[in-house]
């Protein structure tokens, strides 16, 4: 409690007596409750005598208390029902700030919507009357200018006029822009402009248009006309032209990289070097070659010659040394976990199994096995198969994770501590002896999330599992104790995807909060936060060398991030819908992305260019994967179809002819590269996985 006593000995006499009376009543109340130290201190500070205090009656105290309590109630009421001058003071400040922000959309007080519409109409006529060689590039300016004029009309309060303007001219635009325009038409108040993601993004970054120098010169000459001043102002504030020398692009080439909310990527977005090569593998020969025995001393020189011992033969599979890749990062570029002996043995086993791999081609397609989840009343939201193809994990809408064994071996749990102490730790099969045979089960459930599970991911060593959920958390599960060992919190919205690094230890997640985050299993804080997407990040994937992470977003872009610096080193545009799936090629140079727009795009990470677009699916492409030898690309989606593409021919044509967006082939990619299509029986695909021997495993959900 604080007490103001500075006016006791001065000021107005009436006010003095009133204040002193209240003070005496307070002292009387303190004395009543026997707060002696407080009473003495206050009497000394206020210079009050005991005689003055004795003159105050109990009724005086009650009267003052009633007045104080009444004033408190009045103050509380005034907080809810304030006077017109004060009641909306805070909201007035907010409205003033909003008005100031909205004023940015309108250049002057004499705003004339008709003037802007007439300017756009003339621009549209100019584009239509242009020569065919320039028309397609010039038409790319219509969408961003149309949207900016709509913002200005809506900010001026003319909602119906703004809606009428969009409805009148939206037919000029390509179909992939209609979805964005439909969302903008839902804006009903000028203030909603300040909260819309697309509006904020277009205010912060300029819309990028790639255009030949000749096309750009024609456009500049047109907007220099006095009647085009309003268009020229929009162009200078909100558009960025990335010009190049050479012929203007045709319709196909313009559409190939269009579709993003902020246009195409700038050249400087893809200029940084990317070390896409693979890291040098460990020398496995040292794991299998026994240590040389110490040489015996030859004491008797006259003794007959002893037979020489034969040197053990080297395994030709293991003696192959991997060549150093000039495009690979240094082994210490990012700190990678040191391989334990058990990890090396797992890699050795994988290498031996890979030696029996089937070489795939158009004449020798992979065999495919389809796992169908039946009677899943909880709803299957995701599925993942372990790298050694022995386990299947599925996430469900009821927040559970369920794991099945795909082999006769059952899922066993760790023995108790007393039994573990009795084991010989030097035993070669210690990993098997640690598990209790009596606890074996075909399937196990993991409970802990409080929302639908959107992704599961096995660790490379197959003893850990990651899961992410709508509850904004990521959980790390032990597949030895079948329990949650860590809960990672950092995202503030649902987490859509999570992936382990190929070398283990690190993992990456992405969320509705427009970010992706890099984590380490031994830290509950994110190591890197990748910020740059304009909408939620839907999918994520680790590069085979663990130095980079790819993300796909609802802003229709694909980005590549450097784990060491946290910077975006590639920005790739071309999708016409949210990016739903990603996969790196076995060599690390290429990235495939699937989308809600039904398309699959192949990207070259060396320069960020679009290699080709694969058109065959009729619905969202939910999952993509490459064969282990990198020759076949498998894709599947909600259209219940599995497609196999000749990726070897894609790269062969690209390298030999260097087909780029500027020189796009006229042939139908479906006819050239599609190897085979396999339909499922009313079962959308959830996951695809190639085994080490190139057997294709599919997981789907049967819809009755």
Curated annotation (Swiss-Prot):
CDD domains, A to Z: TAF5_NTD2, WD40
Annotated Basic and acidic residues bias: 314-324
Subcellular location(s) of the protein: Nucleus
UniProt-listed InterPro entries: G-protein_beta_WD-40_rep, TFIID_NTD2, TFIID_NTD2_sf, WD40/YVTN_repeat-like_dom_sf, WD40_repeat_CS, WD40_repeat_dom_sf, WD40_rpt
Pfam families assigned to the protein according to its UniProt record, in alphabetical order: Beta-prop_WDR75_1st, TFIID_NTD2, WD40
SUPFAM superfamilies assigned: Taf5 N-terminal domain-like, WD40 repeat-like
BP GO terms, sorted: transcription initiation at RNA polymerase II promoter
Start and end residues of each stretch annotated as Disordered: 287-336
Repeat (WD) residue spans along the chain: 376-405, 448-478, 490-520, 532-562, 574-604, 616-646
Major localization class: nucleus
Keyword terms: Nucleus, Repeat, Transcription, Transcription regulation, WD repeat
Its job: TFIID is a multimeric protein complex that plays a central role in mediating promoter responses to various activators and repressors. May play a role in helping to anchor Taf4 within the TFIID complex. May be involved in transducing signals from various transcriptional regulators to the RNA polymerase II transcription machinery.
Protein name: Transcription initiation factor TFIID subunit 5
